[in-house]
């Protein structure tokens, strides 16, 4: 139903204006300032009353006072109020934006980044383990644990590599060559010197006393024809007691032509007698430590023989210095796979201040390489005189 409160509502324009003046709230300080900033808008000219109709049920018991209050409080806002609220909101938004922009400019941490991006970066560092809360000792312990694990892994890899290589070599030398094929096998260990002392087995094949006598005769023969010895010591050459000079020291050693290695020789355990000293592994093999040369030419010959060729089919090397007495015409010791140079060294004392020192090589006959005279002069200096030197010989 319409118009139950008709007597309490204004019916013309004049009554509407009077009612708006009565209901208009007092101006606050902020609204007054806003009106001064924007004086263009005239609220009196724009104000208009709005008639609101209410539909009340037929059987509802509503007093006129309550109906009038409903009408007053539900009146729609005027155009001026809406405009002022909009302006206030826009001014507040601008002030906030200016404040934020100034804060971003004056804050050096966020000159190129925003606080939101920095927060994400910190979160990412914390997830990766770079948290500032973690102590330096913890970081060092973690680093040491990682380093220890890597070193342990590296040692395991190298141990596996060397273990595999050693297993392959030992399996081929011992299991395949000795046990399966019943052959001799040599396992090299480390390089050795070409010069070594004569073993007891070598001394049995070389007459050292004969070499000593022959070398002394050859030295006295050469010294008797030397001019310096004739003038200062006389001929025949005698010692301070007037007797024939004697040897104070004499030694012999052998030298291989090729580089040598020290290794282990392994053979099947056949229990045969041998001049060597063997160590036995019952029912498996016997072994001993020995020296062997590395013959490059012999290795090439073996490779060519396997394909049906010989070294003479490809080339032949003839050295002009290879004459009688050199290594080419020397015979190897019985039972050895290579020939040896047998060297000797001797000393003959003439008097208290004079000493003859010589060295040479022996093969069937003595071949001297050098003879020196060491003499202490009157001023106390020790002087070496080279009396003989074989330039064509091999040292």
From Swiss-Prot:
Keywords: Membrane, Mitochondrion, Transit peptide, Transmembrane, Transmembrane helix
Topological type in the membrane: Single-pass membrane protein
Subcellular location: Mitochondrion membrane
Major location (coarse): mitochondrion
GO cellular component, as recorded: mitochondrial membrane
Transmembrane segments: 156-176
Family the entry assigns: Belongs to the AIM39 family.
Name assigned to this protein: Altered inheritance of mitochondria protein 39, mitochondrial
């Amino acid at each position: 139903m319409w118009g139950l409160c008709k007597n309490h509502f204004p019916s013309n324009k004049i009554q509407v204006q009077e009612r708006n003046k009565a209901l208009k709230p007092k101006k606050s300080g902020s609204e007054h300032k806003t009106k001064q900033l924007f004086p263009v808008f005239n609220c009196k000219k724009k104000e208009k009353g709005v008639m609101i109709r209410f539909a009340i049920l037929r059987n509802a018991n509503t007093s006129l006072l309550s109906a009038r209050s409903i009408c007053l409080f539900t009146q729609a806002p005027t155009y001026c109020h809406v405009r002022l609220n909009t302006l206030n909101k826009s001014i507040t938004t601008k002030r906030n934006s200016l404040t934020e922009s100034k804060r971003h400019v004056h804050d050096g941490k966020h000159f190129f980044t925003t606080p939101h991006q920095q927060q994400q970066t910190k979160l990412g560092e914390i997830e990766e383990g770079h948290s500032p809360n973690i102590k330096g000792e913890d970081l060092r312990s973690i680093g040491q644990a990682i380093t220890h694990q890597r070193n342990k892994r590296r040692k395991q890899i190298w141990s596996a590599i060397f273990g595999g290589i050693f297993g392959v070599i030992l399996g081929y030398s011992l299991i395949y060559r000795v046990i399966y094929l019943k052959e001799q096998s040599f396992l090299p260990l480390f390089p050795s010197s070409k010069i070594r002392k004569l073993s007891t087995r070598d001394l049995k094949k070389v007459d050292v006393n004969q070499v000593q006598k022959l070398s002394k005769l050859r030295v006295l023969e050469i010294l008797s024809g030397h001019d310096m010895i004739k003038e200062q010591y006389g001929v025949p050459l005698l010692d301070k007691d007037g007797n024939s000079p004697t040897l104070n020291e004499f030694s012999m050693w052998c030298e291989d032509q090729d580089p040598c290695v020290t290794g282990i020789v392994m053979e099947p355990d056949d229990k045969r007698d041998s001049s060597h000293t063997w160590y036995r592994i019952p029912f498996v093999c016997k072994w001993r430590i020995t020296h062997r040369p590395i013959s490059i030419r012999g290795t090439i010959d073996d490779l060519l023989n396997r394909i049906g060729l010989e070294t003479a089919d490809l080339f032949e090397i003839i050295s002009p210095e290879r004459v009688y007495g050199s290594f080419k015409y020397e015979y190897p010791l019985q039972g050895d796979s290579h020939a040896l140079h047998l060297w000797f060294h001797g000393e003959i004392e003439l008097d208290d201040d004079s000493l003859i020192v010589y060295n040479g090589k022996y093969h069937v006959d003595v071949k001297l390489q050098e003879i020196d005279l060491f003499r202490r002069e009157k001023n106390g200096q020790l002087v070496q005189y080279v009396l003989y030197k074989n330039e064509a010989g091999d040292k």
